[in-house]
């Protein structure tokens, strides 16, 4: 009998240590490239004119003036009068879970069957042949974060992916990037479930729902930790707690292994969500949409919470009315410039022009009296979303040792006339506007010219 218990115990350990749906991402073949004489916005708040950038082995090697390389195999790109930036990162995307063409049978972003569906993962809905990926790549997007929708109080896990079209989602997943947890407050969950005659039907019902879920997660985690603290002998005669996929996700949040991203519009609700997080000892990474974030910008900065916001979209529903165009700038400049502002898309068209969205937000901020440089605004679509996705140590800025996610622009990236000419992911060319090199999805196969007469191009 003891031998049998030992075998069962060993099997339990093997199952627990297996990471489900791990990334199998492999980068494309990278090149050794020296960009010379370019104007660089490095994603760290610096503007460097007539500067060189060296990349090799998929990494940023050096940045500065007059870089010389003796290697005959190095490729020289003259970037004079052009601009170089880090690859753009969108922290709020639904590409893949709401793919194009938009048909009901592929609308897989909301598991609107229960107010709390922490057990679902956005990556399990993603269609890897969504033609929107390639269109985003043409706009300089090298990384994007896919979230479930906002029908539920707790909608499930989000995933960060590299913008390289592959045949499996695992081969697109950003290696070792943490999952996120998508939560939503306000009108959406109370409308979806209130219209069915069930809870929540009010904002107070929303908050009761969050707290109930976290209490369950705390109890589940306590049981797991109590079992883990037992001796090997005790584990051989006692069964571990029954596994629960929903509570697995929530307990991982409490262990700081999953990043919390919250769809929320009104200032007082964001403040209440911060209180809920403090009650259950987890951290909020970012509030998304947040049209009233400007009202509590200092509170967000004090708590290290980013505002992932639209540049100029509001008024489409009641809770989205009270916005100002300087919203992003105000969040950015909170507490003497210690705020974390992010420009997000939440839209398959907006993601193609996230640089222009940042330009609009910067212009509105400067019109309101803030002195925001292009270099500072570039952080809103590069290093700040990298921080919110938990991948800042690897990407988001042009710093030696980081991944060579690089965009070469035809001109000032904040100009509506500028286009991404070349996009590199991990030092490998992923898109070249001049030659037409780039991915073609299954949806585009058979079209003589995928760019012709396409609404989203």
Question: Where on the chain are the PLM-derived regions?
Answer:
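Histidine-rich, glycine-flanked metal-binding segment
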Residues: 20-31, 40, 44-85, 102
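Sec-dependent N-terminal signal peptides
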Residues: 4-13
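Extracellular/periplasmic ectodomains of large secreted or surface enzymes and adhesion receptors
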Residues: 20, 28-30, 69, 425-457
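Polyanionic/metal-chelating signatures
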Residues: 132, 137-288, 419, 425, ...
């Amino acid at each position: 009998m003891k031998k049998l218990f030992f075998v069962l115990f060993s099997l339990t350990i093997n199952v627990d240590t297996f990471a489900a749906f791990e990334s199998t991402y492999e980068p494309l073949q990278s090149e050794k490239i020296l960009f010379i004489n370019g104007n660089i916005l490095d994603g760290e708040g610096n503007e460097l004119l007539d500067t060189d950038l060296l990349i090799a082995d998929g990494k940023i090697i050096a940045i500065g003036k007059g870089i010389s390389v003796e290697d005959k195999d190095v490729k020289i790109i003259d970037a004079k009068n052009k601009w170089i930036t880090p690859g753009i990162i969108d922290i709020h995307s639904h590409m893949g879970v709401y793919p194009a063409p938009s048909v009901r049978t592929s609308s897989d972003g909301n598991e609107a069957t229960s107010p709390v569906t922490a057990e679902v993962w956005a990556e399990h809905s993603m269609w890897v042949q969504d033609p929107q990926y390639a269109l985003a790549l043409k706009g300089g997007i090298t990384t994007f974060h896919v979230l479930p929708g906002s029908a539920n109080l707790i909608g499930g896990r989000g995933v960060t992916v590299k913008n390289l079209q592959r045949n499996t989602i695992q081969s697109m997943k950003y290696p070792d990037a943490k999952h996120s947890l998508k939560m939503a407050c306000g009108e959406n969950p109370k409308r979806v479930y209130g219209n069915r005659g069930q809870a929540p039907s009010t904002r107070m019902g929303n908050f009761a729902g969050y707290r109930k879920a976290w209490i369950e997660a705390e109890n589940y985690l306590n049981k797991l930790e109590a079992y883990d603290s037992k001796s090997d002998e005790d584990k051989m005669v006692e069964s571990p707690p029954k596994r629960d996929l929903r509570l697995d996700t929530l307990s991982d949040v409490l262990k700081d292994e999953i990043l919390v991203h919250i769809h929320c519009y009104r200032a007082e609700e964001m403040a209440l969500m911060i209180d809920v997080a403090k009650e259950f000892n987890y951290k909020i990474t970012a509030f998304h949409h947040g049209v009233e974030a400007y009202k509590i910008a200092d509170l967000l900065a004090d708590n290290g919470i980013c505002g992932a916001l639209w540049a100029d979209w509001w008024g489409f529903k009641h809770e989205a009315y009270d916005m100002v165009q300087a919203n992003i700038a105000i969040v950015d400049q909170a507490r003497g410039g210690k705020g974390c502002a992010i420009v997000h898309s939440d839209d398959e068209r907006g993601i193609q022009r996230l640089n222009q969205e940042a330009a609009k937000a910067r212009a509105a901020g400067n019109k309101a009296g803030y002195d925001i440089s292009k270099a500072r605004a570039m952080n809103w679509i590069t290093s700040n979303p990298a921080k919110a996705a938990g991948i800042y140590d690897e990407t988001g800025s042009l710093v030696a040792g980081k991944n060579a996610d690089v965009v070469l622009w035809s001109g000032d990236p904040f100009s509506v006339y500028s286009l991404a000419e070349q996009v590199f992911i991990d030092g490998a060319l992923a898109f070249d506007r001049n030659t037409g090199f780039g991915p073609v999805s299954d949806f585009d196969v058979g079209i003589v010219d995928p760019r012709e007469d396409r609404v989203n191009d």
